[in-house]
């Protein structure tokens, strides 16, 4: 806890026999960030109290941490951070409070301030020490505003750490700084400190800040309080001494924590995601289902994307389409993705070939034998879906899961075409599959809890985020999507200028404007969905 850390630091500082302190972790990560549910650090439990008292509690708690880190900086003893693994969020802010930072030379290690990704701002000096070390550049603003992590080498070139070394030499390198009489004072505490790159009121600084403000407004439409607070904290803080700057950061941190938008982001993007990774919503009474082979019916854009992310997880894929050329084209989708990664040195030829070897493009349904899961990804047409369902179920075992990637058609109705409706479930991916993290799992009227558990195990294996929803036309996401894009088209028909419609959509917090989104998903798809919906309503007498 923070209290235990404070007690240890105070003892080390007061012990005259201690000439310097090396901070390292006994775990694989140095520190991968603070616990965002910690009331000691963030005070989320106090937000529900009287607003003034809550703000005071959060501010005072934050300043306690700020003062603790300042005591390290001003102790007169050199502190060295030996970064053996990920140093993120508060973990990296501890490093920033050290006088020297040495990291293992490993590109898999992440160094960064990812708080903005979950709606918060660095709250232990990150907005003040980072720019004092590295200046305010486009790269550094991305580091803070977007939470983009650096590798140790990149952090070194940016000026955020002082040295990279081999794992075996990490502690020796850290000790060497102390033994060699390394400074025990931070640059900003030295007389004559000059801010790297120029302050905001210099000509160069004015250009940087004007561009940063404009870019932030363009990308966020002021919907994200954390990014605005980070920019303000840096702008104001770099113009005053460090102690005043840390108080500025603490005030902005308090303001952000008190903001309902930030609280919602923390809940959705951190707390709930942590719960999902631990099996929330998964039925508890069933063993883990290890999917080793799946069949994908339909090798179009969606089916091809599903094939890629599934093979990437090490699962064998049988990719079926009406003719061999179409199936081969579906596999080619994965080839193109991997070739692009290869050109950027994000994969190797060996890894590429291994992934592609897992995808078998074919027209032969008999190759589905032994599949643990089927994903149907054909057009939104009931007749076609019924046909491929029958062909696939004739080949698979009675325990295999059959999932439909339908975006709008009720699962209970589609399950009527199945010989085993208890094993039938909706698995709705989003395009492009390799980039979109969400998968919607839809429970039909007869879908069993075991089928739900198996499906959630598969979705987590391919590293997607599952949400479980009830069965109704459009489910959850497509109903939101349809309403959003439909309203945009309706406004256009009423004569409202497209630019106004698009800006209004972005101002609501949506990542893409409604008319642009309609174009991106293809208007013919909307027509097919509408046509099938009309047929269904007529059949139901509606």
Residue ranges with predicted function:
Residues 1-24:
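Conserved CoA-thioester-binding segment of acyl-CoA-metabolizing enzymes
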Residues 28, 108-110, 323-325:
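Helix N-cap at the beta1-alpha1 junction of Rossmann-like dinucleotide-binding domains, i.e.
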């Amino acid at each position: 806890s923070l209290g235990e850390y404070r007690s240890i630091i105070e003892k080390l500082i007061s012990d005259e026999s201690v000439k310097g302190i090396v901070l390292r972790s006994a775990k694989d990560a140095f520190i991968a960030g603070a616990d965002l549910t910690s009331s000691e650090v963030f005070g989320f439990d106090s937000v529900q109290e009287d607003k003034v008292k809550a703000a005071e509690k959060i501010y005072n708690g934050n300043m306690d941490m700020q003062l603790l880190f300042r005591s390290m900086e001003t102790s007169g003893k050199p502190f060295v951070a030996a970064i053996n693994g990920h140093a993120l969020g508060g973990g990296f802010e501890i490093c920033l409070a050290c006088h020297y930072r040495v990291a293992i030379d490993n590109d898999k290690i992440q160094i960064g301030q990812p708080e903005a990704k979950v709606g918060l701002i660095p709250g232990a000096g990150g907005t003040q020490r980072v720019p004092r070390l590295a200046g305010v550049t486009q790269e550094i603003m991305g580091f803070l505003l977007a939470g983009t992590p650096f590798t140790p080498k990149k952090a070194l070139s940016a000026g955020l750490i002082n040295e990279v070394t081999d794992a075996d030499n990490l502690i020796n390198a850290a000790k060497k700084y102390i033994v060699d009489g390394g400074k025990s004072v931070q640059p900003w505490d030295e007389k004559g400190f000059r801010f790297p790159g120029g302050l905001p009121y210099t000509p160069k600084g004015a250009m940087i800040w004007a561009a940063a403000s404009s870019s932030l407004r363009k990308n966020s439409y002021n919907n994200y309080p954390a990014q605005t607070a980070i920019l303000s904290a840096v702008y104001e803080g770099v113009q005053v001494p460090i102690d005043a700057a840390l108080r500025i950061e603490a005030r902005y941190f308090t303001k952000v924590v008190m903001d309902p938008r930030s609280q919602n982001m923390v809940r959705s993007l951190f707390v709930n995601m942590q719960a999902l990774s631990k099996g929330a919503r998964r039925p508890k009474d069933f063993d883990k289902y290890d999917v080793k082979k799946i069949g994908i019916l339909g090798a179009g854009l969606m089916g091809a994307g599903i094939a890629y992310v599934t093979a990437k997880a090490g699962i064998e894929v049988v990719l079926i389409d009406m003719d061999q050329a179409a199936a081969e084209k579906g596999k080619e989708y994965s080839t193109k993705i991997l070739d692009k990664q290869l050109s950027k040195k994000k994969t190797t030829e060996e890894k590429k070939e291994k992934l592609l070897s897992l995808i078998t493009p074919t027209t032969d349904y008999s190759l589905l034998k032994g599949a643990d899961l089927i994903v149907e990804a054909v057009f939104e047409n009931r007749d076609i879906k019924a046909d491929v369902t029958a062909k696939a179920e004739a080949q698979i075992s009675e325990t295999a899961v059959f999932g439909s990637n339908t975006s709008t058609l009720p699962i209970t109705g589609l399950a009527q075409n199945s010989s085993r409706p208890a094993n039938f479930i909706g698995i709705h991916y989003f395009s492009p599959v390799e980039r979109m993290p969400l998968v919607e799992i839809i429970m039909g009227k007869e879908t069993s809890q075991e089928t739900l558990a198996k499906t959630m195990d598969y979705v987590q294996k391919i590293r997607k985020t599952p949400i479980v929803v009830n069965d109704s036309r459009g489910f959850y996401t497509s109903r939101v999507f349809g309403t959003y894009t439909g309203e945009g088209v309706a406004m256009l028909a009423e004569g409202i200028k497209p630019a106004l419609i698009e800006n209004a959509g972005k101002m609501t917090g949506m990542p893409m404007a409604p008319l642009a989104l309609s174009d991106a998903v293809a208007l013919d798809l909307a027509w097919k969905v509408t046509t099938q919906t009309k047929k269904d309503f007529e059949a139901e007498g509606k």
